[in-house]
Amino acid sequence: MAFSPAHRLLARLGSTSIYKRVWRYWYPLMTRGLGADKIAFLNWAYEEDPPIDLTLEVSDEPNRDHINMYHRTATHVELSGKRVLEVSCGHGGGASYLTRTLHPASYTGLDLNRAGIKLCQRRHNLPGLDFVRGDAENLPFEDESFDVVLKVEASHCYPHFSRFLAEVVRVLRPGGYLLYTDLRPSNEIAEWEADLAGSPLRQLSQREINAEVVRGIEKNSHTSRVLVDRNLPAFLRFADRAVGRQLSRYLEGGELSYRMYCFTKDFAASR
């Protein structure tokens, strides 16, 4: 199927300021259209070959492919007993799953989407889990407040990614970790890598997960389509399908790079 001029324009805009302004309104629209009671995960699906063998509760099973992404990102380090901050937590599904299964001392989900945060606060009522509205580039927390910062997608929408990294360094305690998964178009890889290299955070691991995301999208396509068709108006249904098809195509063709990282804040970085 050929894409319309509007879709081709959005693809060319990439991560420009216009694109980022669009996404500031897209997520609240998704929240009002879908609701956290319908879709608790906004991240792309992920699956390995052979498949990840997670034991899930019955209520989590429909979200297995999205949970896989959270599980792989979060288990680079031990979360048990740690103070965890998730930046851009979406509808809170990942926060709920990780709180219930990995047992952090506390877990705070932050998002700029006011409607999304209200839904999270209503739905995900668990001991040690809380949600706050805030800006990823101006985190509303004291210095050295967290042991781990988790970031699954969305940073490609931030106007100033380097400011987010500076805020991560500020709120992490010495010896803490940034667990990070996101994607960039090929023409922005150099800038992405330069921002990461320019941060005081030290990289412990990195791997490209294009194949795993494509596999997850393919495996999850029917479930996602049913939910979207039931709950979104026609123009949003079309946009959602177009983005999914293009994402798979670009990942397979190398026009996008989807990566998973683990960073640490060395003690020297806090001096």
Curated annotation (Swiss-Prot):
Q: Name one GO biological process term.
A: lipid metabolic process
Q: Which domain of life is it from?
A: Bacteria
What's its top-level EC category? Answer: transferase
Q: What is its EC number?
A: 2.1.1.-
Q: Name one GO molecular function term.
A: S-adenosylmethionine-dependent methyltransferase activity
Q: Which NCBIfam families match?
A: PthPhpthDimycoMt (NF045823)
Annotated protein name in UniProt: Phthiotriol/phenolphthiotriol dimycocerosates methyltransferase 1
**Which species is the source of this protein?**
Mycobacterium ulcerans (strain Agy99)
Q: What is the lineage of its organism?
A: Bacteria, Bacillati, Actinomycetota, Actinomycetes, Mycobacteriales
